[in-house]
Amino acid sequence: RVRGYLDEIVPFFNILAYYRLGYSVSRALLSVFYKVSVEYARPDPFRGLPRDSIVVYLMNHRSNADYVVVAFVLMGDVSISYAVGEWARAFPLEYIFKSFGSYFIRRRYREPLYHAVLRAYVQLITRNGVTQGTFPEGGLTRDGKLRPGKIGLHDSILGVAADPEIRARMFVVPVGINYDRVLEDRTLVRELESGGDKPRTSRLTQAREVTSYVFWNTGRLLTRRWKRYGRAAVTIG
């Protein structure tokens, strides 16, 4: 069972996939959907950080595009590993995320052995200085407001700071993300109208919805009826 959990969680980071394929694809996609802007709290946020620093980016979760947007704006400085939910455990998304260094988590799975394995992995990569991006809300906001925080994953990450040597190397960086319009706007409106409950859908249904979305927008591009979703703004620090 432990081996099965590890196979599910642990990624296989490929530096060429991240910096060549990842950069090219993210740049192409974002140029279609958004004009991306980034602002730093200080001019050179990475200057002065020790080489063995442990950096955790703490972000609000507005859209599933958050993963791509933040990774893109940081790509010139650092690779970033995310905890990705079960929604992406479908081919080819699972393979892509794992090759980019992200690990998978089951958000509502209460089995103690699974959580022991997950905690051990998260603390291992934290001790070894893997830069991580996390969402304290634990899921996508439905109405744009910040959701109540969930501490499980962050308890695992920050738990290693009990060691004074590691605590001295750890830096938590806040990241604010906002959009003029999110990609999931129609889906989120339907969920709010239905009382805020997110309906459970099969992977086949999810695949159909994604395929339909891609083909619909491709048609708009080909017929020159496409308009961007506006600006995606990121504030770091």
What is each residue range found by the language model?
Residues 4, 8, 12, 80, ...:
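A cross-family acyltransferase "interaction/gating" segment
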Residues 105:
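Hydrophobic residues at beta-strand termini and immediately following loops
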Residues 76-78:
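Extended active-site and interfacial segments that coordinate phosphate-rich ligands
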